[in-house]
């Protein structure tokens, strides 16, 4: 399958395929934090991210969630549907943590009675600012119906993920999703789902995600390997 590099991101390289509606995503060993300010090459990270994300996306597909995932091609590669990415990071929070705790001056780990959905404008030059529905409409990123769908679909995905992670003894604190338009103009889930873009805590409150790298708490791949091993025990 011939391929040509069309985009190089922090965590993945994207290549064309012979089918104009399909792309190959190649996961890198690079870890970044604080919008790329902290950066490090970590051997084995790309393989683990691809394994975890492929596994989760396969389960989401089976559960009826429309995603860009087609199949895992190799240790670091997966075949995806080509989408036009919506320039929003859709964050769902089940517990207080990270920037939420800093913004509102509250402790981490407080359970939210109703999960909170937030939007962040995907713009590196602006440091991905926190925005609301009216900003999304002003920037002509999405309309009312599309905004409502993004929130509804994110909440539906959350209900699935919470159950799966609870089954393996992990608490889903929060996560970030990205969506895009497929060739038919339908909004589908894109990007990835791995400890790079979610927070997972074990029963003792230990971080099982990229906060290990972000906060210098230990070896990233050791933690990701534990998450991957646990996921393989899911029914």
Swiss-Prot record:
Biological processes, Gene Ontology terms: 'de novo' IMP biosynthetic process; cobalamin biosynthetic process
Catalytic activity: 5-amino-1-(5-phospho-D-ribosyl)imidazole-4-carboxylate + L-aspartate + ATP = (2S)-2-[5-amino-1-(5-phospho-beta-D-ribosyl)imidazole-4-carboxamido]succinate + ADP + phosphate + 2 H(+)
Its EC number(s): 6.3.2.6
Associated pathway: Purine metabolism; IMP biosynthesis via de novo pathway; 5-amino-1-(5-phospho-D-ribosyl)imidazole-4-carboxamide from 5-amino-1-(5-phospho-D-ribosyl)imidazole-4-carboxylate: step 1/2
Disulfide pairings: none
Enzyme kind, highest EC tier: ligase
GO molecular function: ATP binding; phosphoribosylaminoimidazolesuccinocarboxamide synthase activity
PROSITE patterns noted in UniProt: SAICAR_SYNTHETASE_1, SAICAR_SYNTHETASE_2
InterPro entries: SAICAR_synt/ADE2_N (IPR028923), SAICAR_synt_PurC (IPR033934), SAICAR_synth (IPR001636), SAICAR_synthetase (IPR050089), SAICAR_synthetase_CS (IPR018236)
Gene3D superfamilies assigned to the protein according to its UniProt record, in alphabetical order: ATP-grasp fold, B domain (3.30.470.20), Phosphorylase Kinase, domain 1 (3.30.200.20)
Alphabetical keyword list: ATP-binding, Ligase, Nucleotide-binding, Purine biosynthesis
Organism domain of life: Bacteria
Keyword Mitochondrion attributed: no
HAMAP family, per database record: SAICAR_synth
Family statement: Belongs to the SAICAR synthetase family.
Stated name of the protein: Phosphoribosylaminoimidazole-succinocarboxamide synthase
Organism: Streptococcus pneumoniae (strain ATCC 700669 / Spain 23F-1)
Protein's gene: purC
């Amino acid at each position: 399958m011939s391929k040509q590099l069309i985009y190089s991101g922090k965590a993945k390289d994207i290549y064309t395929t012979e089918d104009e509606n399909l792309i190959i995503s190649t996961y890198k060993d690079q870890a970044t934090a604080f919008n790329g300010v902290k950066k490090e090459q970590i051997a084995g990270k790309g393989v683990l991210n691809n394994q975890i994300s492929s596994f989760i996306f396969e389960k989401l597909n089976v559960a009826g969630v429309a995603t860009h995932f087609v199949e895992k091609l190799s240790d670091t590669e997966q075949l995806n549907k080509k989408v036009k990415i919506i320039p929003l990071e859709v964050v769902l929070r089940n517990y207080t943590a990270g920037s939420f705790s800093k913004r509102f001056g509250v402790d981490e780990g407080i359970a939210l009675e109703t999960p909170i959905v937030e939007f962040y404008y995907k713009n590196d030059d602006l440091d991905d600012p926190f925005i609301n529905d009216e900003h999304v409409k002003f920037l002509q990123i999405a309309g009312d119906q599309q905004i409502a769908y993004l929130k509804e679909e994110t909440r539906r995905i959350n209900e699935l993920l919470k159950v799966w992670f609870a089954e393996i003894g992990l608490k889903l604190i929060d996560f970030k999703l990205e969506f895009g338009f497929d060739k038919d103009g339908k909004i589908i889930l894109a990007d990835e789902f791995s400890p790079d873009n979610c927070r997972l805590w074990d029963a003792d409150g230990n971080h099982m995600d990229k906060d290990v790298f972000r906060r210098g708490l230990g070896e990233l791949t050791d933690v990701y390997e534990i998450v991957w091993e646990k996921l393989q025990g899911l029914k």
